[in-house]
Amino acid sequence: MNRLFCIITFIYFIVCEPTFSQQNQTASFKIMSYNVENYFDVVDDSLTNDSEYLPGGMRGWNYEKYIFKQAQISKVIAALGAWEGPALIGLCEVESEKCLKYLTNYAGLKSFKYKYAHFESPDARGIDVALLYQPLAFKLIHKEAVSIHFPDNPTIKTRDLLYVMGKVPTGDTLHVFMCHFPSRLGGALESAHKRNYVASVLHTKTDSILGRNNKANIVIMGDFNDYPTDASLQKALGAKRLEKPYASNQLYNFMYSIHESNKGSHKHDGSWGALDQIIVSGNLLTSKTFYCHEAKVFDAEFLLENDLKFLGKQPFRTYNGMKYQKGFSDHLPVYVDFFMKDL
């Protein structure tokens, strides 16, 4: 089975992916964002509500399922990244540093020698964001957790934003924000103010960076629990659709066109949408040394299953309701290929 998967993956990239010579580029730098959906370990954290994913819990979570979940995540990363693996991988819904240690040392990923940036956040369920990086492709300079404190209700806890800064092989500095905005639990409109506020905090951070250098290279990615056309992203963050001429100090959302064509990374009530997004500063669209053109959804067939209720396909999840079905996630990965040139 594993041998067949490797052969299929090889054929996919040979047939579907453009070669560097065709693009006249010297190298590619792939960035991936993936909500892996409930990647929990099996250790009880007394500070969080993780009982659902513990041995003896309501889902019957155990060590075997934990290791299988790890293998499934590894399979997705390897398939998307081909022989070199993505240079940067943003992950949502990771419970602990232990999960990251196991994942980066798993046989399917160990050869890529990933390191990770991660902080424990105050999320009630204990799920965090993290960034995996290959040290030879991304030299880490700084990392920090950007805490969120809602002024109207300080008792509400949510996930931190993860900010990481580093250098890519061209010598360019790259600022990366990994995000998982508050959920739509209780209703999209009723919870919108939380996402709007988190987006405003993020906007303050990016404005500060662009204020120091209006040609700063910024990548913002993750699961925003909102669509590109929603107020949190369009107004509070100020991320626009891609329209030339590009301004170096403006943020642009790659997922506008994907969302408006009724495609996306997540399916809800029969409709696809782009909750998972990659947003970049304008300089990354015009730079001559490190630049990108578009984002894509990785919708390989093995990540999908038949949607029996609404027809078509849907993401192949670990659980369908309470039924364990050995899938992957309720989200599909999104990614961008950056191209690098020496001048």
Spans of features found by a protein language model:
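Structured beta-strand-rich core segments of catalytic domains in phosphoester-bond hydrolases
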Residues: 94-182
